[in-house]
Amino acid sequence: MYDAVNAGKMDVILGYSTDGRIGSYDLVMLKDDKRFFPPYDAAPVVSDKLLKETPEIKDVLNRLDGKISTKKMQELNYQADNDLIEPAVVAERFLKENNYFEGE
């Protein structure tokens, strides 16, 4: 879809606001002022088993709350999808740049 709109074969497409290709194709996201589309908010999800075995993981993961903007997520996704950097490497770089491991 992104290639098609970039090539002028389409004028409008539906995509995720965090897709890294939005910036790479210089596309414009329209504001959904009618709230037609449900919000897509990423959230950590863990099993009850993991939470019981490692209760401290809750606080560790909650430190990410509100730390990744849509723009930043686009950049991170672009690195993984376009630059073909392993997602684990992209994530580790982000965490280090934001002092996530500080004090550990």
What are these regions (language model features)?
Residues Y16-T18, D48:
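Short secondary-structure boundary segments
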Residues D41-T54:
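A bilobed periplasmic-binding-protein/Venus flytrap-type ligand-binding module shared by bacterial periplasmic
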Residues A7-M10, R21-R35:
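Ligand-binding "clamshell"
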Residues M10-V12, Y40-A42, I57:
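A short pocket-lining beta-strand/turn micro-motif at the edge of beta-sheets
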Residues F36-F37, R63:
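A detector of mature, structured extracytoplasmic domains
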Residues G15, S24, P39-D41:
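Active-site lining segments that contact anionic ligands and/or coordinate catalytic metals
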Residues P55-G103:
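Ligand-binding clefts/hinges and TM-proximal coupling segments of bilobed small-molecule sensing domains
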Residues M1-I13:
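Short helices/loops that flank or line small-molecule/ion binding pockets
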